[in-house]
From Swiss-Prot:
Protein name (record): 3-hydroxyacyl-[acyl-carrier-protein] dehydratase FabZ
PANTHER family documented for this protein: 3-HYDROXYACYL-[ACYL-CARRIER-PROTEIN] DEHYDRATASE
Keyword Transferase: no
GO biological process, one term: fatty acid biosynthetic process
Molecular functions per Gene Ontology: (3R)-hydroxyacyl-[acyl-carrier-protein] dehydratase activity
Cytoplasm listed as a keyword: yes
Major location (coarse): cytoplasm
InterPro entries, A to Z: FabA_FabZ, FabZ, HotDog_dom_sf
Species of the source: Mannheimia succiniciproducens (strain KCTC 0769BP / MBEL55E)
Gene: fabZ
Location in or out of the cell: Cytoplasm
Amino acid sequence: MTTENRPAKIIEAHEIMTLLPHRYPFLLVDRVVDFEEGQWLKAYKNISVNEPCFTGHFPGQPILPGVLILEALAQSMGLLAFKTHEIKGGELFYFAGIDDARFKRPVLPGDRLELFVEVIKERRGITSFTGVASVDGEVACEAKLMCARR
């Protein structure tokens, strides 16, 4: 990943909501801090003590469910896809698959989940990515993901 001394490409929350169909409580990307079309994207999600999932996962010891970390990576992947391709009306990028998901540390209230996705390959409307979610530079989750354009 290189930015070649260019200004960061930022996507604010209001634009994220024009690109992704997700809404509270399932909009899991707060801000994109940089990206390179067709290559990679860096974003983050601030984890609040008020996340709805914490009422049951787990009472008294809240931990962000791994499936929501994967969904945040998938939404980051979708944002990169939307910023890379010219979109026809009503077209979406669907989460199509996941491989080799690994969870390495818990994500807790107060953490800032840093999201990084990078394109591996693209063919026939299917794009493969690697995704890494980290907190304070420590990997929390990594996986290979796929999305399909429909």
